[in-house]
A protein has these predicted regions:
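Alpha-solenoid helical repeat scaffolds
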Residues: 1-177
Length: 177
C-alpha cells in the first residue's frame, strides 16, 4: 500500500497491491484496482494477468478464458510469458480431459501475427506431436519456425522427415537448400 501511495502514477505498484488484496481475500478491492489499471492502460500485461487470476479465483470461467486470450494476443508481452500461459492452458486442458480444439485455436491466433522468435511455434509443434497429430497439420507450424529462425535445425529436420515420409523428394531438396 505504501508504494502505491508513494508512486500513484506507477501502475505496477497498484497492480501489486491488487494482487495482494486478491491473495488476502479482498477480491472487490482487487477488482477495482485491476479495472482502473486496465482503463488507464488496456495493454498492461501485468494488469491483464492479474485480472485473469481474479476471474479464475472467482470462478468466472468465460471471462477467465477471454482474459487469457487478451494476454496471449498482447503485443507488449514477451514470448516466454505467453509460452508459460499456454503451458498452463495445455495442462488445464489435459487435466480436465477436454479436446485440443481450444488450445489449437489459441495457437492459430497467436501464430497469425508476427512472432519475435520461434518459442510459440515450437511449443505448438511440440503440442501437436504430443497429441500425435498428422504430419501434414504440423508442416505450416514448422515452416513458421523456419520463417522466424531459418537456422533451426530441429524444425528443418522435422520438415525434411515429413517430406521423405511422403516420398516428396523435390520438397526434400527444397528444404535442404
Amino acid at each position: 500500500e505504501n508504494l502505491s501511495k508513494e508512486y500513484p502514477n506507477d501502475v505496477r505498484y497498484r497492480v501489486m497491491l491488487g494482487d495482494s488484496y486478491l491473495d488476502n481475500e479482498r477480491p472487490d478491492e482487487a477488482y477495482a484496482i485491476f479495472q482502473a489499471a486496465l482503463a488507464e492502460d488496456p495493454e498492461n500485461a501485468q494488469a491483464q494477468l492479474s485480472m485473469a487470476s481474479y476471474y479464475e479465483r472467482m470462478g468466472m470461467d468465460s471471462l477467465f478464458y477471454l482474459q487469457q486470450e487478451a494476454v496471449l494476443m498482447n503485443s507488449k508481452l514477451g514470448s516466454s510469458v505467453k509460452a508459460e500461459v499456454m503451458r498452463r492452458i495445455i495442462l488445464q486442458n489435459e487435466q480436465t480431459g477436454k479436446d485440443s480444439t481450444r488450445v489449437l485455436q489459441l495457437f492459430d491466433r497467436m501464430l497469425s501475427v508476427p512472432q519475435e522468435d520461434a518459442t510459440i511455434a515450437t511449443l505448438c509443434y511440440s503440442y501437436m506431436q504430443h497429441k500425435q497429430m498428422d504430419d501434414s497439420v504440423g508442416v505450416p507450424v514448422l515452416e513458421k519456425i523456419l520463417e522466424v529462425e531459418p537456422d533451426n535445425i530441429a524444425a528443418r529436420y522435422s520438415l525434411l522427415m515429413v517430406a521423405v515420409r511422403k516420398n516428396d523428394y523435390a520438397e526434400a531438396v527444397r528444404i535442404c537448400e
